[in-house]
Structures are given as structure tokens and as C-alpha cells.
């Protein structure tokens, strides 16, 4: 089989979308790719073979092996390299003989590519007309620069997440448990944790607004006594609520993970709470939270 395209009868994206950046593929497609490629077998090429075709070195591959989702990490790392594109990914999968992946995910990849093209066209149409000399003098904003560890420094491919985690530093241990339960298991969710994912040097209010509104599908609020004293958490919560009045979009999910001496915040009382302190429902806690964060 030629390495230039999928096998006959496969449902891979058409050539007009093959030059699109890897950022066109959403989390659903990436998770399904991981299901195919994370499994180590003797009969089919796995993610390590794909990494070698992408010119990753031995030590880089060994480092990727330490992650719960090595395929996802591989795609994140590769998409910032020269030549990375949807079309190139399909060529490599074909070269490795993974026609099963192309047949299964082809329609979904095509759909993602078409959505990406449509979004780019809409954004282009909405741009105001400006004189080039004036436009070039406008300083770049934080939204256009790299603000997270996996961002494109120029802002062309912003990193996106399933949920922004609003928390106080004193509650970081529970946040770390959340990472283990939601990112490093079969749920494979992608959380935005400021202390881990956000680069220093930019206004915290600007970063929070950008991430909550444009980069994260939902926001999880870790409620505690210390949370009630945090101006930063107060801003993040009120900002998220302003984006979804009445919680109609199920955008904000409060979590109570330990007993509180102070009264539960009134602005969150009308939203269903995930209560980690209730022993009767604790066994269902992570499943309920994961499903809530996975909703479209």
C-alpha cells in the first residue's frame, strides 16, 4: 500500500483538509486514537511505532511512556513540530498498516476538519478591516500569546481543556487527587490546573477570563472555607456564572470535598453540588463528575 493516503474504502478526510494543523482534531478523536494506539500488541503498530515515524528520539519516547495516555501526549508534543498536520498523521498511520484506525475514525476526523475550516472562515469574516500600518502597531494581547505550557507561542493553536479547576492553594492535594481520578484513568479528561498548566508572567485576571470563557468547556469549583476568602476564586466563579446565567448550560460544577465551618456560598446554592463528604454517595462521586464534564 502506498504511504500517500488511506486504503481504498476508508473514510479518511479528503485531500483538501489534509494540510490542516493537528489542532483541528478535537478531544473525542484524540481519545479514540489513544484507545487504538495505547495498547501494546505484537500484531499491530502502536504509539511507539508512530512516535518513531514522527522522528521522536529514544529518550523522548521513554519519557512519553511514563504518562497514562502516551498517545495523547505524543500528539500534543508533535503538533508543535514542523510538518505536523492531519494529512501527515494519516500518511503515517497508513504506512504503519493501521487501516483499522482510518476506517473507524475517518468520518470523525473529516467532521473535525470541516468544523475547523468553518470556524476559521467565520473568524476571518468577523475581522474588522484595518490599515496594515495601523494594525501592525497594535500590541499583541495575552489572548494571542502562549499562556499555557502546550500553547503555540504565537497563539495560532491555543490549548483547550475539558474543565478549568477553580481552587485555593490549600486545597491542592484534593486537586491532585482529581487529576489522578479524571486524567490518569479511562476517563482521560483534560483539566486546566493553574499551578501546573499556566505560564507565569501574565495578569491572573486576564488569564482566568481567557481560559474560562474560550479554552475550557466547563469549570469545577472546589469549595472550602479557604475558598470563601479568596478574591481570585470569587472572581473566577462570578465570571463563569455570568457566562451561563441560571446554569442553563451546566457550565459550572461545585464540589464540596471536606466539612466546612462557614456557610456554603449563596451564589452556588441553586446548582447541584458534587458532595465528596457524603459517605453514602462517595463511591459514585468520580463517575458522576466525569460524566458531567464529558457532556457536549
Swiss-Prot record:
It comes from Pan troglodytes. The gene is MYD88. Keywords: Cytoplasm, Immunity, Inflammatory response, Innate immunity, Nucleus, Phosphoprotein, Ubl conjugation. The intermediate domain (ID) is required for the phosphorylation and activation of IRAK. Homodimer. Also forms heterodimers with TIRAP. Binds to TLR2, TLR4, IRAK1, IRAK2 and IRAK4 via their respective TIR domains. Interacts with IL18R1. Interacts with BMX, IL1RL1, IKBKE and IRF7. Interacts with LRRFIP1 and LRRFIP2; this interaction positively regulates Toll-like receptor (TLR) signaling in response to agonist. Interacts with FLII. LRRFIP1 and LRRFIP2 compete with FLII for MYD88-binding. Interacts with IRF1. Upon IL1B treatment, forms a complex with PELI1, IRAK1, IRAK4 and TRAF6; this complex recruits MAP3K7/TAK1, TAB1 and TAB2 to mediate NF-kappa-B activation. One of its GO terms (molecular function) is Toll-like receptor binding. It holds the Pfam family TIR_2. Adapter protein involved in the Toll-like receptor and IL-1 receptor signaling pathway in the innate immune response. Acts via IRAK1, IRAK2, IRF7 and TRAF6, leading to NF-kappa-B activation, cytokine secretion and the inflammatory response. Increases IL-8 transcription. Involved in IL-18-mediated signaling pathway. Activates IRF1 resulting in its rapid migration into the nucleus to mediate an efficient induction of IFN-beta, NOS2/INOS, and IL12A genes. The modification Phosphoserine is found at residue 244. PANTHER family: MYD88, MYELOID DIFFERENTIATION PRIMARY RESPONSE PROTEIN MYD88. The lineage of its organism: Eukaryota, Metazoa, Chordata, Craniata, Vertebrata. The keyword Ubl conjugation applies. InterPro entries: DEATH-like_dom_sf, Death_dom, MyD88_Death, Myelin_different_resp_MyD88, TIR_dom, Toll_tir_struct_dom_sf. This is Myeloid differentiation primary response protein MyD88. It is found in: Cytoplasm; Nucleus. Residues 110-155 are annotated as: Intermediate domain. Residues 159-293 form the TIR domain. Residues 32-109 form the Death domain.
